[in-house]
């Protein structure tokens, strides 16, 4: 039996701010706000609006959608959401999934193959995803105790490295907001390039970070660690409604020699606490779908024992047959190189070759 759909309503910026103000205790991810949608627009992307979902007059959830027009797979993506204002039960989530299917199948302005969002209680038609989205685990640092207790809760290794960084002359500065884009482009992006090359990942280009700093400046901090006047490590944090996130960071080889990233993050915690934030999420640690995050997980575990599991991102197909056909095609494309290698190995061995010893 298909669950009864919720009533849904698109929210203007004023509507969203009114809803948020009426629910001060709910953690709303910055990615689920109109301010993040403005940032996406500045990048040339297509925010499709924020909707609220109601059970009668009771607000259940909200979701901000980003339209994607990738070849053969048009979709709507909810980044780090939806936001839940009531208990996230299996029944409530099933109703939201059914509502989203009905909502966008009937929307003449968009024809997505699927909607992608975080789902905690997975049941049909939820499936996939074709590729993974948001990280699934994070470490959270409680900023409500006094600074001495926060520091004492770190692992001994972290406390020692912070002290060593101070003795080695590492200096942490908060960059003036009007200089963020310039400083990032000329001094900090090269550190990101070095980090990406060293750790084997692809970073965004400098324009992405500069746009982030320009468009979301009211909700960001940029802090930099210097050694002998030279920047060696930097971080960007976000803040919204008292919850901060350690969002982007990079460090040079010189930073590692001086333990600068440890002192930098500690100084950031103190600044965030002073600004009224009650917690800081160190987003993105090792999980089943993100084993490559082992190294950063080791670093982040130094600052808190609290690990929070975030619901995994899944797909909600609106056109199941087309979705399954695409899923099969993508799987075959991923498997093709391995299949080709096995065929080549077999040809080299020849028809009389044996697979193992007698």
Predicted regions and their residues:
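A conserved beta-strand-loop-helix scaffold within acyl/acetyltransferase catalytic domains
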Residues: 5-55, 62-72, 119-132, 150-255
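Short, high-confidence coil segments that cap the C-terminus of an alpha-helix
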Residues: 46-48, 109-112, 274-277
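Aromatic (often tryptophan-rich) hydrophobic motifs at membrane interfaces
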Residues: 77, 94-103, 209-324
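Short, polar/flexible loop-turn hinges at active-site or ligand-entry regions and domain interfaces
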Residues: 84-90, 145-154
